[in-house]
Amino acid sequence: LIAGLPLYRLSEIFEDVRTLAGYNAGEIQLESLKLLPGTEMRRRAEELGIRYSPLPPYEVLQTNEISVNELQTARQLSRLLDGFYNTTAWQAITRKLILDDNDFLRRFLEFLIDKNLIDQPMSLEKRGLVLYEFCSMHYPAYKIMVTIAWIEAGMSLKKKPAEKVKTKRQMPPEYWEVIYGNYKESLRLCFLPIDDNTQNGYWFGFESEIQKAEPVFKAKGIMERCQNTQSPQINTDKSS
């Protein structure tokens, strides 16, 4: 996406981001238009209503359709996309929020600006903490997804996004639906409940013998056995 193109409004940029997210784009790049010397668009800049910087990199400053402040918003939106959507760990939850709520991008952008974070370099962990804080305030139903992303990114289970995770002496349930990996008794389990039913939630298994922060096993606990579910004991026998 290119902000500053003739006839291209800020509202359309937000719409196009949502469209690309709907197509499961691996990355969404948003850049500012630059009018390089010798190009046709630079020669027609006045005709097209484009004002641009006379100094390199010759970025567009304003058009008939997008103001100086709106171009600044587009630049900040680009930062948001790079930090969250274009980062594997946070892409799935960011995509879901973009698609589920038309106002998410503007609300999250406003949050990052108010916190003076939009132009600050943030570690992977910091971005997860920020996203969890934001969802806790504005999208509490999505906190569980942020926590799952946090765990699968190998983040600390002692930090706020993992506040609901149970780690001590966790034993597998009678039945679960395996999402990935193979269960074995040597795995260190943690459990993320999704409601008051202690069996309803997600199980993650970590290798105890190797220094690997990411889980190697994931399953969803269920109340009774049905198709596509396994007993941990049966699965253990197969993998031992």
Mark where each language-model region is.
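A structural motif corresponding to the C-terminal lobe/cap of the Radical SAM core domain
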Residues: L1-N102
